[in-house]
Amino acid sequence: DADDLAELLGEDTRQGKYFSAFDADEELVGWFAFSCEGDCVALGLGLRPDLTGRGFGLAYLEAGLAFAEQRFRPSRFRLSVATFNERAIRVYRRAGFSPLRTFDHATNGGVHRFLEMTRPA
């Protein structure tokens, strides 16, 4: 929504945490967000909607993880995903993430169940 977009694009928010991802033709394909929590990097990501479901997810995720490993040198990664997003969960599992716990989170006008996943760097 508009508030989320304004937050993501605001200079105060980005401060070395949010990164745009471009393809070889310099077209925007998505974004990554990284937050260091001790030796763990919490990861957020988004892929341009017209690119989802086309087999790009794993390569996109692996590129972001490689970038974060080089930049932040974590010992592990953590992410959270809505439990209804089964396609993303399959990609995260293929990338080596394992379920850690589920929790409820208020977002976008409702309360949704999320799955926290982790993997070694």
What feature does the model see in each segment?
Residues 18, 22, 60, 92, ...:
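Sequence-level detector for tyrosine residue identity
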Residues 3, 63, 73-74, 99-100:
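Generic, low-specificity signal for short hydrophobic/alpha-helical stretches with a mild N-terminal bias
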Residues 1-52, 58, 67, 71, ...:
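Acetyl-CoA-dependent GNAT
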Residues 45-62, 82-90, 94:
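Conserved glycine-rich acetyl-CoA-binding loop
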Residues 74-89, 94-95, 101-121:
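C-terminal "cap" of GNAT-fold acetyltransferases
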